[in-house]
Amino acid sequence: FRYLITIENQSNEIIQLVKRHWNIMESTKPTQIFEGPGVVGKKSIIKTGQMVQYESGCIINSQRGAMKGFYTMINHSTAKEFNLEIPVFQLDNLFSLN
């Protein structure tokens, strides 16, 4: 499955993506957890009003699944980390629904 995530910085601060955390759920396995630095090899710095997109993918063995997680960001002004939640989204094999 491929997915596209868009982040828009609507704050007045410069932020940077530093880590990712994903929960990948499918019907045939326990939830898989993936964590690591950056996203697709990038630790993007996002200025006020700027938008970035990440395209990636995951392999699951079932026809349907779901993902949720968060990106850990850092505020460049305060050096404080915060989590940017990514709500659950479905992974559906459209061909199996026909």
Residue ranges and their predicted role:
Residues 6-12, 75:
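Asparagine-centered strand-capping/turn motif at beta-strand->loop junctions
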Residues 12-33:
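Short acidic, flexible loop segments centered on an aromatic residue
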Residues 32-64:
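Intrinsically disordered, low-complexity Pro/Gly/Ser/Thr-rich segments with frequent PxxP/GP/PP motifs
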Residues 1-3, 68:
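Short, solvent-exposed loop/turn segments enriched in Ser/Thr/Gly
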Residues 21, 39-42, 82, 87-88:
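Extended, polar beta-sheet/loop recognition surfaces of beta-rich domains
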Residues 26-29, 41-51, 91-98:
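Short, surface-exposed linear segments at secondary-structure transitions and domain or protein termini
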Residues 19, 35-36, 56, 69, ...:
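Residue-level recognition of conserved beta-strand positions in structured domain cores
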Residues 59-98:
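Terminal connector regions
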